[in-house]
Curated annotation (Swiss-Prot):
Classification of source organism: Eukaryota, Metazoa, Chordata, Craniata, Vertebrata
Species of origin: Bos taurus
Membrane topology label: Peripheral membrane protein
Domain of life: Eukaryota
Designated gene of the protein: SNX10
One BP annotation, GO: vesicle organization
Residues covered by the PX domain: 10-127
Protein name per its UniProtKB record: Sorting nexin-10
Length: 200
C-alpha cells in the first residue's frame, strides 16, 4: 500500500441504538445514537457519540439549507403520521434514512464547513444553543463546546483514536463516506468552519 493511500481522509457515520424516551406522562419519542469515526482535520474530535431525535434532524436540514442555498440537500425520511415507535420495522427504516441523510451531507465539503453540523454531531447542545454558539452569543466557542461534551461522554479509549477505521466494529448497520479536501478549504484545524446563520 502506498503511503498516500494510508493518509486518505475518511468519515464514517453510524445511526444506531434507537431508544424510547419519556417526554412527560403522556408523550414519548425515539432518539438515536449518532457515532462518528474519522481522521478528517475538519472534525474537532476523531470519535464521538451523541443522541438526537427526529425533529432535531429536521432542524439541522433547515439550518444547513439556509446557510447553503445553492446546495441541494438530501432528503430526510418522511414524517409518517402512522409511525409506530413500537414497530421495529418503522423504527429501523427511519434509522436507516437518517443515516443515509448524514452520510450524504458529510460528502459535501460546503456543508462540512458549517459549524452547526459539527455541534449537532459532536456536542450535547440543543438547536437554540447551537444557533447561539455559532453566532457568537455564548461564552464558549464551537471547539470548547465539543471538547466539553467529549470529556463528559468519552465512549472510546484515548488509544483508539489513532487507529484505522476498521479497528472499530459497531455492528452490521454502518455506512462510511470518504472525501478529500484541498488546501483552500483548510484552516488551523483543517476545515474553514462557517459561523453564519423549526422543529416539527
Amino acid at each position: 500500500m502506498f503511503p498516500e493511500q494510508q493518509k486518505e481522509e475518511f468519515v464514517s457515520v453510524w445511526v444506531r441504538d434507537p431508544r424510547i424516551q419519556k417526554e412527560d406522562f403522556w408523550h414519548s419519542y425515539i432518539d438515536y445514537e449518532i457515532c462518528i469515526h474519522t481522521n478528517s482535520m475538519c472534525f474537532t474530535m476523531k470519535t464521538s457519540c451523541v443522541r438526537r431525535r427526529y425533529r432535531e434532524f429536521v432542524w439541522l436540514r433547515q439550518r444547513l439549507q439556509s446557510n447553503a442555498l445553492l446546495v441541494q440537500l438530501p432528503e430526510l425520511p418522511s414524517k409518517n403520521l402512522f409511525f409506530n415507535m413500537n414497530n421495529r420495522q418503522h423504527v429501523d427504516q427511519r434509522r436507516q434514512g437518517l443515516e443515509d441523510f448524514l452520510r450524504k451531507v458529510l460528502q459535501n465539503a460546503l456543508l462540512l464547513s458549517d459549524s452547526s453540523l459539527h455541534l449537532f454531531l459532536q456536542s450535547h447542545l440543543n438547536s437554540e444553543d447551537i444557533e447561539a454558539c455559532v453566532s457568537g452569543q455564548t461564552k464558549y466557542s464551537v471547539e470548547e463546546a465539543i471538547h466539553k461534551f467529549a470529556l463528559m461522554n468519552r465512549r472510546f479509549p484515548e488509544e483508539e483514536e489513532g487507529k484505522k477505521e476498521n479497528d472499530i466494529d459497531y455492528d452490521s448497520e454502518s455506512s462510511s463516506s470518504g472525501f478529500g479536501h484541498s488546501s483552500d478549504d483548510s484552516s488551523s484545524h483543517g476545515c474553514k468552519m462557517s459561523t453564519a446563520p423549526q422543529e416539527s
